[in-house]
Amino acid sequence: MARGSNKADKIAALISAFRTSGNLDRAFDNRAAEALSVNLTDLHCLNIVENRGGVTAGALAAEAGLTTGAVTGVVDRLERAGYARRVPDPADRRRVRIEVTDHFYASADEIWRPVAADWKTELARRFSGDQLDLIAAFLDATNELTRRHLERISPPR
């Protein structure tokens, strides 16, 4: 990434690198979805469920920006593929939570473990702890700004 000498040039270079990262992330997700034989929406929902350690259908719908009816279809497909299951919510047995399965973890591990290993090795080699803190703060800030603009474009359902 070329870096200019003034702050505006540096911000422009960061935005360019961030956009490239987003494009690569989408390309990787496309390939991962294909490898798992799911569509991108289903993969997105799997990532939400896995990252949150299980969610209700309503919470998944809200975070994914889908209707509860659409989430029912997603979860049905993920159950058929063996990647997710519905379980009673321990806090309220009238509700159902969606969790990922061991089959999903095994399948996902083949895709993401090598990536995670490279990230850990290369980032530790290239950056100091303080630099990693700064990068994490940058990503937190961009995530916050992006969430704000997601709501501006289309309020959560």
PLM regions: where:
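N-terminal leader segment of winged-helix/HTH proteins
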Residues: 1-36, 81
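C-terminal regulatory/oligomerization modules of transcriptional regulators
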Residues: 1-5, 130-157
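Canonical helix-turn-helix DNA-binding module
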Residues: 53-96
